[in-house]
Amino acid sequence: MMMMMMTSVVLGPFGNFMIPLMIGSKKVAFPRLEAASFWFTPISYVILLSALWQGGFQSGWTSYAPLSIQQGVGQDAYIFGFGLQGLSMVCASTNIVATIINYRAPGMTWNRLNIMGWSMLSLGFTMILSVPVLIDGLYVLTLDRTCPNFDA
């Protein structure tokens, strides 16, 4: 949970602001994706925090389907907040990867890209590659919550 929250901040508002400055670009590749990733982040934090006041989410550090069969709105808000967080990270990472590849300054070769640029590029590729895992995890959490197979 903590890694997902910190990664979305590093990729989203911070990354979309710092990457054009580091590579000598005037803008990001997709400004609307930047705005979407920026605004999805605080909304998902509010939804995650509101889950605490709506009965709480009692899944612990894991949101595995047998542990997420708790009834109530808290667990649903928790799942929706993490889904929105994942959407924010995918928007930001797509924007960062496209910006680094396409909008570098004319003299900026791959050898001159600093370590923060390389780390953001590798983190962005990793987040894009994790999209099927995110989709599958949300699918399992939302559809298997009401499955009676896990009942004792």
Give each language-model segment a name.
Residues M1-A152:
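Membrane-embedded and interfacial regions of multi-pass energy-transducing membrane proteins
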